[in-house]
A protein has these predicted regions:
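Class I SAM-dependent transferase core
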Residues: 1-11
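Conserved SAM-binding loop of SAM-dependent methyltransferases across substrates and taxa
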Residues: 39-51
Length: 124
């Protein structure tokens, strides 16, 4: 059981590292807010990639990028930063996020594609 848990944790850390590296290289945000993270792995990976990342709070609303892990289980905040990245950890269902983001004037950037071993994500 512990071996299985350790393997899962290692895979999660690698997934977060790859995603953080891609975010830092392609989007280059100075700051990022992470919403709905079960563990701080993505925040830590973003820090290592050179992005000032913190959990989403009222004070973090001024971030350049909002990263939402597993949007099916997160409620959309009233105020959003300039870019929103939906990261699908369990399912790829955004549960109304796409429609609400469109109503608020956000449109999907189809140049951002999910690649290889990196997890599925959608940039708005």
């Amino acid at each position: 059981m512990q071996l299985e848990k350790a393997k899962e944790t290692k895979q999660d850390m690698e997934r977060c590292r790859l995603l953080a590296q891609r975010i830092a290289e392609e989007l280059a945000p100075a700051t990022a807010a992470v919403l709905n993270a079960e563990t701080p792995a993505l925040e830590k990976a973003l820090h290592r990639a050179g992005v000032d990342a913190n959990p989403f709070t009222v004070a973090a609303r001024q971030a350049d990028l909002l990263v939402v892990e597993d949007p099916a289980w997160a409620e959309m905040p009233a105020q959003l930063p300039g870019q929103v990245l939906l990261v699908f950890t369990g399912s790829n269902v955004a549960e109304g996020w796409a429609e609400e983001l469109a109503r608020r004037g956000y449109y999907r950037d189809f140049r951002w594609r999910s690649r290889g071993r990196a997890q599925q994500a959608a940039l708005y």
